[in-house]
Amino acid sequence: MAKGVFITATNTDIGKTYITALIVKKLREANINCGYYKAVLSGAEIINNNIVAGDAKYVYNVANIKGNPNKCVSYIFEQPVSPHLAAKLNNVHISMDKIVDDFNYICNEHDYITVEGSGGIVCPIYYDKEKIMLTDIIKKLKIPIILVSSSGLGSINGTILTLEYIKKHNITVNSIILNNYDKNNIIHIDNRIILEEMTNLPVYICEQYSKDIDIPLKELKQFYDFI
């Protein structure tokens, strides 16, 4: 039976893909069969007239995963907009059943699954007669969250508000990772201390341009839960 975790963030462009890639890389370098999955990707790359899931390609490259990265993303859109708007622009119906089926397929191929979200935690995935929010997917997959946040000014507010929203939806958060952390920045240092005290969660850091995630392997594995 596979174990999974969901990587989400306090906002878009916080560094989910970067952190996800480092996590998958760390597990795979420890000879752990870890895979990657993303339900919906917008803002895809066009290479040689072919659409490419850029986030997935990045994770594959960093973590040295072989194969076609498009196969680990259920829906891929070219427009760099919210998933629900991308689906509307392309007249595509996003199906929860397909997401679950694709996720289960990845699970059958791996022992650990790292799932990357889209945007921040409050992200409409499909918004028509049927409505799917990102939190609906997380609850359907029944896996806990690692929350990625910024390290700088405003991090406390954004992190606490995100955690309150997650708590409202009865989803477990295992840890927080502060991205682009500067060990010499007094704001970053204080944010980490305050967030640990306010949330009672372990708060890890990832310095800019890091090639490894600063989380002990034993602790990282504990954040994954059985699916």
Swiss-Prot record:
EC number: 6.3.3.3
Binding site for Mg(2+): 17, 55, 116
Pathway: Cofactor biosynthesis; biotin biosynthesis; biotin from 7,8-diaminononanoate: step 1/2
Subcellular location: Cytoplasm
Keyword Kinase applies: no
GO cellular component, one term: cytosol
Description of how the protein assembles with itself and partners: Homodimer.
CDD domains on file: DTBS
InterPro entries referenced in this protein's UniProt entry, alphabetically: DTB_synth_BioD, P-loop_NTPase
Residues reported in the UniProt entry to bind ATP: 13-18, 55, 116-119, 179-180
Co-factor(s): Mg(2+)
Family per similarity comment: Belongs to the dethiobiotin synthetase family.
Function (record text): Catalyzes a mechanistically unusual reaction, the ATP-dependent insertion of CO2 between the N7 and N8 nitrogen atoms of 7,8-diaminopelargonic acid (DAPA, also called 7,8-diammoniononanoate) to form a ureido ring.
Enzyme's top EC category: ligase
Active-site residues, record numbering mapped to chain: 38
Residues holding substrate: 42
Entry protein name: ATP-dependent dethiobiotin synthetase BioD
Single Gene Ontology MF annotation: magnesium ion binding
TM region(s), chain numbering: none
Catalytic activity as recorded in UniProt: (7R,8S)-7,8-diammoniononanoate + CO2 + ATP = (4R,5S)-dethiobiotin + ADP + phosphate + 3 H(+)
GO BP terms, alphabetized: biotin biosynthetic process
Gene3D superfamilies noted in UniProt: P-loop containing nucleotide triphosphate hydrolases (3.40.50.300)
Keywords: ATP-binding, Biotin biosynthesis, Cytoplasm, Ligase, Magnesium, Metal-binding, Nucleotide-binding
